[in-house]
Amino acid sequence: MAWVAVEDRSAPTASPRSAVASIGALQALREAKDSSQTVALDGACVATIHADLTADVDLTKAAKLRSNAGSAFVATVKAGSFDIVGERARAWLREPNPHGRSNAEVVKRWANGMDMSRRWSDTWIIDFGVDMTEREASPFTLPFEHVRAHVKPLRSSNKRASYRDNWWRLAEPIPKMRKALAGLPRFIATPVVAKFRLFVWMHADVLADHQLVVTARADDATLGILHSRLHELWSLRLGTSLEDRPRYTPTTCFETFPFPAGLTPADTAHQRTEALPDGAQIPAELQPAVRAHAEAIARAAKHLVDLRDAWLNPPEWTEALPEVVPLGMNSSPYPDRIVARAGFEKEVAKRTLTNLYNLRPAWLAQAHEAIDAAVAGAYGWMDESPALPDDEILRRLLALNLERAAAQR
């Protein structure tokens, strides 16, 4: 009988923010299960290795929690050349239309996974919403004519009737996501597929692509929970993979995750926030005991974001340019555009989140440890530290998931 050694995904790694090695281990396990080989986990023969590549924490038992529903979404699908470069978008935003309405209604900033892990490509998108008719869309002259010329020929032969018949609209405009985001000043985004599990803020005017998962919350506490080691481990084990990169999906990673009591998506479904003196945002109307934990998480998360932003866009190398003011408006609805100062273009181009997490400087690790400690405190865990085994964290989270799943039956 042959043996195959498999790296235990529950063992702490030198770089816990990367999961590439674990994906390779999973493939080794699959090959072993398809043969007569006996599997050794970290050098020891084990009776059972679960589908999530652990010997004693069976996360395949984790259930979707109703308290998490309706908050995280895979974003829009284009199915056509709806995207345009920033220079063209800004020109269109200054153009009049025969019905007197602004192109800002249908020309929006756009972001995909690359814009998150690298730098924003200054791509915009034409978006005629979820139910705008062809007759209603056509007076937005330049955007409509672009779509008619570049999208309609491709869509006319599409086998799916909704794509073919509604060629001027995005193939999957995700109305539930739009409804959940309505009225928020910002939202949380993470790449579907990435080397590192990163969460960032995106301005409300940005339309996200399907290579991003969007969470409809504007408070720093929720971002901190999602960016904690606890959620990262959970999402790595319960997510899938694309080649050597972990994939994040709302159904497996988000909807199963047992948020701290009082800070679940159901608890914060009202989406209202309260600003702390330092500018951090927490969910409004929290009970005192929960509020203390929310404040700690929010402050730690805001500190991380502030440090990252300063590294990505150092003021010595970059400058903020006022964004375009669309025709008919008195001020720009968009945040200032960050560009490199003359002579620093190459240096700024290297300042990406992927490069930052590859470097993982001490200040970044410390900022994440502060988030982890604050989130663990919200669970009542006083022993959380970088030395706490991954398997122990997952065991506790699974127990909480199963407890809540049983209560919702």
Where are these predicted regions, by residue range?
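Conserved beta strand-loop-helix elements of the APE1-like EEP
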Residues: 1-12
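Leucine-rich repeat
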Residues: 14-17
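S-adenosyl-L-methionine
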Residues: 1, 19, 23-44, 51-409
